[in-house]
Structure formats: C-alpha cells, structure tokens
Amino acid sequence: MAFQKITVQNPIVEMDGDEMTRVIWKSIKDKLILPFLELDIKYFSLGLPHRDATDDKVTVESAEATQKYNVAIKCATITPDEARVKEFNLKSMWRSPNGTIRNILNGTVFREPIMCKNIPRLVPGWTKPICIGRHAFGDQYRATDTVIKGAGKLKLVFVPEGSDEKTEFEVYNFTGAGGVALSMYNTDESVRSFAEASMNMAFQKKWPLYLSTKNTILKKYDGRFKDIFQEVYEANWKSKYEEAGIWYEHRLIDDMVAYALKSEGGYVWACKNYDGDVQSDFLAQGFGSLGLMTSVLVCPDGKTIEAEAAHGTVTRHYRVHQKGGETSTNSIASIFAWTRGLAHRATLDNNERLLDFTEKLEAACIGAVESGKMTKDLALIIIHGSKLSREHYLNTEEFIDAVADELKARLLKAKA
C-alpha cells in the first residue's frame, strides 16, 4: 500500500553543511524525509567552499530566511582555523556559522539527551534527562580580545549616546613585556529574552529551573543576569510555577556542576554562553554520547527556532569516506535536527499528521538502537574495545536503512 505523503503547508529553511555530516544529511533527506513529506524547502548551502565564495553572506541570508519562515534545520558545519584556511585556500578565517546565526536570531540553545535503554550512562545516577539552556548571545563569543605588547595602561571607556560625559575605568597597568586583554558585553534585552525562554521551557516540561553564574566574582556582570532572571520570574512566572509544583533557583556555577553530577536529572539548567558551551558537552558524554543529543535554538518571539546536530562534521570518518572506505557514522542527532524542526513546523501550522510523523521517526531511531541496530560509536559503549567485532554494528547507510524500515513499519501499523 503506497504511503500518502504528508503535505507541509509552510516552508522550512534547510542549512546544508560539511564533510561526513553533509553525506549523511543527504541520505537522511532521501530516505527518511522526502519519501514521506510534500515539503517546500528554502535551501542554503553553508558548506565552507560556498561560504567562502559568498564572503559568508550565505550564512547571514540563511538566518534572515529563518526569521521569515520561523523554522530552520541545520547540518553541522566547519568553523575554520589556520589549518582549514590553508586546506580550503580561504579568503578569510570566517567566523563560526553557528555564532553568526545565533547572534542574528538572538536565541537560547536548548540541548537534551536522547535516551536509549540499552546505552549505559557514564553517570548512572542520571535516570531523567537534563535540558541545558545556553544563552547564545554575547560574552566571549562577541568579545574583542587583543595581545598587549609592552608596558602601558589598559582602560575601559563608555561614551553615552548624545553626551561627552564618558565613564572611564582603569583595568590594568602593564609594567612588563605585555600580556592579553579582553572586553565583552551583553544586553538587558538579550538576558531578558534568555530568562523568558528558559522559564517557558521549564514550565512546558514541568521541571524546575536553575540559573548558574559566578556572581560572587563578577558582581556587576553576572549579578545583572541574576537580577533580571529574578525580575522575570517574579513578574511573569512565579504563580504559574507554584501552581505546577516547580521552582526557579539561582546557583553558583561550581555548586551547580557538583549538584548536576549527583542529581537524578529532570530539570532545566540555564547557562551563560561559555558555561553552556562547556557543560552541554559534559552532559552529552555523561548521558552516553555526543551523538545522542538534540540541539534547538529558540528565539525570543517564541515561534522561531533553528534545530541542529550538536556535534561536529566528523572529519575523521570523512577522510575514510573520501578514500572509498567503510564508515559507521552516527546519524541520530542529525535525524533529530529534522524531527525537532519539523515538529515545530507542525505545531505552528497545527498539522497533526506531520507531528505524528516526527514522533514516529524519533521512536524509529530509538527503536532501532534498542533492538541492537546501531553504529560503531554506540556499540563501543556497550561492548568495550577488543571484544567489539564487525557483526556488532551497522555502517552509515545500513543504520539509516534500518531506521527507514522501522519507520515504515510504525507508519503501516498506525494505518492498519
């Protein structure tokens, strides 16, 4: 019986990527998305050669399209360093596309583990998921840093608009050979949006919310985050939280990391930009794998999102693939980028068939793994080292085929 394709009323923005993830991205589209959906895709290639050819304008255009259509689904991309500039003969060492997109969309990145019963956790006490919300604007990622050469005074100056009454702070008096300096910032508007997004996410999940800062050291900077979160909580969320039996609490980052390690999970953790970058990888590994993590950027308007894979472009596998060798690359996070993006499209469009499809595709991924069909990285978590043999895992395409079979079975079962 032929499957009647699901019509998706409104477009989605697709941001293609680099290396091995670009290879699996195409396979996911061809085997798990396009056979089942009638879909208008606004396509942007964020592969490094095309970013270079367009002077990185394509990255900005893709973010602007996301603002227009409200849903973007992004493949992993290369952030070039010196070696990549040489390898690709780039005009410039282009900025991280994720950083560019996040700064335009000014959102909060929420990451959450994909839990499979048969994948052991490095932190066995984590029996419930932990959703980490990373403020995706400003701080170190928008900072101006410099190398200081020689002796001299470093000053921080603020000149108010329409006034000559500048405020000047002496930061440090360099007396030796020099050193390094950094100036960074954030805005009240962005922190307020971060607070709203975090409060909303925790309320939707009916989980408590924790904000972590180091306000004992950065009394003004981190203190502002703490104050704004408290204001937003008191004004808009306190009564809702009390009714739902959940709570909001501020904690010092060091105390929060210790608490996270001994907790059972089941909460939303709001992190400043750098803390979120670091702690999301700590959580991913603790739950089992970076390849089992969802990542969604939620914008302040509440209706615009960008879903992505939380890992890199898997360069090592791509080198093997280029030589015609067999790879076993985990595509689950990339599949979940599609499902989370499409699920949001379904919610915006009130499209129940599409929402049901995304749930079945996610269940097909987890079902495949729990039935013993998985890629090498996951098999290695279960069967350590030399005990692992080729029969214990599937290659890149075999795994996507296994998910496709599982998905078709679930769709047919629902139809019957």
UniProtKB/Swiss-Prot annotation:
Which GO BP terms, alphabetically? glyoxylate cycle; isocitrate metabolic process; NADP metabolic process; tricarboxylic acid cycle
Site annotation Critical for catalysis: residues? Y141, K214
Q: Which SUPFAM superfamilies does UniProt cross-reference here?
A: Isocitrate/Isopropylmalate dehydrogenase-like
Binding residues for Mn(2+):
D254, D277
Q: Which cofactor does it need?
A: Mg(2+); Mn(2+)
Query: What is the reaction catalyzed?
Result: D-threo-isocitrate + NADP(+) = 2-oxoglutarate + CO2 + NADPH
Keywords, comma-separated and alphabetical: Cytoplasm, Glyoxylate bypass, Magnesium, Manganese, Metal-binding, NADP, Oxidoreductase, Tricarboxylic acid cycle
Binding residues for NADP(+): T77, I78, T79, R84, K262, G312, T313, V314, T315, R316, H317, N330
**SMART domains under this entry?**
Iso_dh
Molecular function terms, GO-annotated: isocitrate dehydrogenase (NADP+) activity; magnesium ion binding; NAD binding
Protein's name in the database: Isocitrate dehydrogenase [NADP]
State the species of origin.
Solanum tuberosum
Q: Which gene encodes it?
A: ICDH-1
